[in-house]
Amino acid sequence: MIGQAIKLIEKGLVPDNLVRAGIRKLCQQRLEEESAYDCEKQSMQFHDFWQELKQSHIAIKTKEANEQHYELPTDFFYYALGKRFKYSSAYFDETTKNLDEAEEIMLEMYCQRGQFIDGQSILELGCGWGSLTLYLAEKFPNSQITAISNSNSQREHITAIAKERGLNNLEIITKDINEFEPGKTFDRIVSIEMFEHIRNYQQLFDKISSWLNDEGKLFVHIFCHRYLMYPYTEDGDDNWMGRFFFSGGQMPAADTFLLFQQNLSLDQRWLVNGQHYEKTSNAWLENMDKNKKHIMPIFEKTYGKDFASVWFQRWRIFFMACAELFGYAKGNEWMVSHYLFSKK
């Protein structure tokens, strides 16, 4: 039944309001599958997955995840994202008028919560299209920023923008996080929505601790569930997200990182209501629909003419799925979390 419905949706034959209703039903189904309403079963599932994470590589299926998102032509993200190319949740306060403003608010929030100041050495893990790297380079001209991405197209994009803006205080490295070793230490390490692709947090946190100066700090932004932690799998019709957009990924719990403090100590955690991500995702969808005539030729070149329309619908579904997930229960079920750690 779900498989047949998805085929109709991917052909654009189902109205958005029905698609969104179906997504909300799947959100409820996910809560039930993860034993959200049975504390004993949920506790055991959490424990079992925690043990699995400790035996895993730092990250898995990095090639697939890279292909699903980050090696798409930059032009698509130019038409879908905001001015800063921020491919993660923005923040909409009571005065925010549009996505561009919401991006700026969240980027400035990182600077405040991460305690960034001019003159620091900074490492960004998983820099995406450079929204934060470029923001930091502009705001802190005496800082030196090193950023790593698993995507060569992202490196090329960031390097080109930096050249346009006359920024020479940043270095972009294309590297799989499993293999990365910086060879030096930093005052700040930051990561925005990359740790959802990580499996072995303890191993990565141990590495990060060794990459920090004695007074250094780690700032992390992730999306998460309030208390559930589970992997995205690819089997079955209802695991559409894992199959097409999130291979090897997982949904951390807001408390997951509290279990991995052997070499890093948590200073503070902030929860950000999921409705900010809901609004961000809906803005991406609106941009995508508005720019369909520009996006379709990109998809024809990327996916082939026979599959361009299907992939246009898949990206629409992806943005709707994100919006409905994070908007569920008024943003109090799935959300964003920020963390500030100090080196022990």
Language model segments and positions:
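Conserved SAM-binding strand-loop segment of SAM-dependent methyltransferases
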Residues: 164-177
